[in-house]
Amino acid sequence: MALLQIAEPGMSTAPHQHRLAVGIDLGTTNSLVATVRNSIPEILTDEEGRSLLPSVVHYLKNGSAHIGYKAQAAQNTDPKNTIVSVKRFMGRGLKDIAYAENLPYDFLDTPGMVQLKTVAGVKSPVEVSAEILATLRQQAEDALGDDLVGAVITVPAYFDDAQRQATKDAAKLAGLNVLRLLNEPTAAAIAYGLDNGSEGVFAVYDLGGGTFDVSILKLTKGVFEVLSTGGDSALGGDDFDHRLFCWIIEQAGLAPLSEIDTSVLMVKAREAKELLSSKSETLIDAVLTSGEEVHVTVTAADFIQMTQHLVTKTITPTKKALRDAGLSVDDVDGVVMVGGATRMPHIRKAVGDFFQSTPLANIDPDKVVALGAAVQANLLAGNRAAGDDWLLLDVIPLSLGIETMGGLVEKVIPRNSTIPCARAQEFTTFKDGQTALAVHIVQGERELVTDCRSLAKFELRGIPPMAAGAARIRVTYQVDADGLLSVSARELRSGVEASISVKPSYGLADDQIAQMLQDSFKSADVDMAARALREEQVEAERIVLATQSALDADASLLSDNEREDIVALLDSVRQAGSGTDHLAIKAAVDALAHGTEEFAARRMDRSVRSALSGKKLDEI
């Protein structure tokens, strides 16, 4: 673990003490690396002066790989072994990958994360990403002339535990020490906040190659606070390419294409999309493997019309992020545009129209995330300069909870909570003599465990046997600055403890998270009714167990008629508990509680007499 330097507040480290750290934007389409030199963040270029590294890896038969531009050239000739947009596969199972059937890869649907079969062997998305990160590390060390102490790597705000952990694993494989994982919109806000001295409420609209993220941030006196986040993984520059690709096939009347022809036309579609940002029309020329020639002219108006629905879809999560932050459009002081896809004029116009202001784009949208990450990396490495006294407050996208009796969810950390954070709650045992407690960690907004996502389970054993409800078990949830969760459980009387770091097998897609939130809103009334029923059923089960235990121990305190009355009340509770009317269950439980008050009083009297028997007054 790298040691942080300690210096007087406001003092910068001496030049010979400057520690080399970088910010890395590991993007779907392109990746970048940046650092801070002479207090100014800058992109580190390769030996040919190029700042962008295409996020493409081409595997060869001899086991080696080409990364970046050289790999990009192989997309048309060897698409099966040329992995592009690998970020979309990080922490995902095969069923989670959009358009999987249209991709040229041989996927292996292995437990956990999907694998890709190449001529160089089976590769995981983590290994592919590590190739890109290792190239960026080498590029940075060549430019800076020394080894790096660490890196801040950016991830989409909606990446969950598994996707973040996969990113950290890839960095470790690439020989990088991860100082922190930083949400991409937050990195952009850091760049704008420091460069432009901005204060107020800002929306960060981040449309990259494969994901769409929107974050609402508040910048006040050096504090960067994320108020809410939103997003949709079905929206990205790749989807605009795919729509134009389909349009080309329709216009040219082409039959089903081979993998190579598909790859050729996808590249042509991407090139045309980029040209239409500055031209009114462009000609798409291609020669297919069959010898057939494709000549199609596409205008900017055509492109706007065919992709307008994609642009409109970005506004829905933007509206939701504002609602989550408790704000309206009028409360937003500015909009930051991030991601290469925001270069498209009709996207900028749609965002400007929605927020009724001209979006901020004076920092290159391809570079702004890496520049912000570099600033954060510089601070975490200990290179604090005068004025570097700002605070970063990020949030988690979905609530984290625990399963309680009856399959109910008790939320421990609500969504949009600022991280890093820790929350603790006390729980107890349900049965007499219970010596173990199962801790089931879940993620989501619904009231029942079956409607949420299971993250992990562990057991706390060694609880001293005692009456139900007597044990005190403190469960603590901790989310670190990278958004990774750890949970511990401790029985307070005995001190026995168990813990777990949550590393689920694969992650949630952005649209799955958005769908979970939508489901929670739509099902709120049904969920609350289901929760009310389960709570009453759990209480009924508890009081039946307690009453039966009391009868078994102290039936001699009751007359035959009294005992029969209590047994009848018990039967009523059991019968009501098997039904679906929570009010009927509550009425039966209340009747049993009232009907056993005298019995409880007699048991208490006996216990007191037994405790005082044989003792003198001065001993009490």
Curated annotation (Swiss-Prot):
Alphabetical GO biological process terms: iron-sulfur cluster assembly
Domain of life: Bacteria
GO molecular function terms listed in the Swiss-Prot or TrEMBL record: ATP binding; ATP hydrolysis activity; ATP-dependent protein folding chaperone; unfolded protein binding
UniProt keyword list: ATP-binding, Chaperone, Nucleotide-binding
Record function comment: Chaperone involved in the maturation of iron-sulfur cluster-containing proteins. Has a low intrinsic ATPase activity which is markedly stimulated by HscB.
Similarity-based family: Belongs to the heat shock protein 70 family.
Descriptive protein name: Chaperone protein HscA homolog
Gene: hscA
